Amino acid sequence: MESAKRVLVCLTKENSLLQCAKFVQGITGQYSANNGDKALIHCGLDRNQFVISDRQFPSSAPVQLQRPSFCPIKNLSPTQAAALPGEIRNRGVDVGVAVLVQSVNKKVLLTRRSKSLNIFPNVWVPPGGHVEPGEQLLEAGLRELREETGLRLQGVPWCMLGLWESAFPPLLSQGLPSRHHIVTYLLVQSNQTHQQLQERLCPDEREVSACVWLDTEIAKCIVAAEDDAKDSGKPQGPAPATIRVSELINGSLSQSDRSMATFLSTAPKEGEAVERISTGTKYALSLWLETLPKAPSREHE
């Protein structure tokens, strides 16, 4: 059951009064030129509100906010907005937090959401969830990481990667939106290898059905398979045929190989959801890759 008290997104622009974001309001477009799909904003938690502003404010951080071109909220017509049930139209915009755990050998953890979940079932994402009242972003992210995977991380270096405007269903062709979030992607860096972290995994099968560690080369292939590109779902260069994942079967993790094509799949325009990496996760992976040292140039070798 949803908490009666939720941390909601509030907006201010050009020193206007702070107002709660409306469910049908395209937030990214509010801060970008010509209703575009990315914007540089300032954000932070303030008295159980997640504030987004075009200007710096105390304890805020500058960060990129982005949405997909096919964002349902962006493309919602006035008629469709009016057709939303009152409890949806008046629920505001929730705040989510997702944690990319980076091992010391430069791999990141993704989890596959359980098929039984109502939102984004069977989709690969970083561990995460809602921010509870009174929590800071990192505190919420580490709590969700612990609850979903069993990993307990404390005192780890971290940074905010970026914000993603998310809606579910992810495409208007799949139905009118019932959820609208601003997802905060955090990067936390462990001093352990992915093998050491893997041994500590104890996923909650109510939320997680599998785990995978991605290296930088696989992440690059996944990022290249954009969800709204004409050639999406096809490898953009050398890619392995399969990826080793850990599936949760009868309470225990079991190793198996999944086709690389699964991780390059995109959201179907109609019909049942398919196993895939979420569009927001691809965005987070692209931001993660940008944090890594660039390989030295070979031009003069």
Curated annotation (Swiss-Prot):
Mg(2+) binds at residues 144, 148. It is an enzyme of class 3 (hydrolase). Pfam families: NUDIX. It catalyses: a 5'-end (N(7)-methyl 5'-triphosphoguanosine)-ribonucleoside in mRNA + H2O = N(7)-methyl-GDP + a 5'-end phospho-ribonucleoside in mRNA + 2 H(+). Signal peptide: none annotated. Belongs to the Nudix hydrolase family. Acts as a decapping enzyme capable of hydrolyzing monomethylated capped RNAs (in vitro). Hydrolyzes monomethylated capped RNA after alpha and beta phosphates to form N(7)-methyl-GDP. Shows low activity towards unmethylated capped RNA. This is m7GpppN-mRNA hydrolase NUDT17.
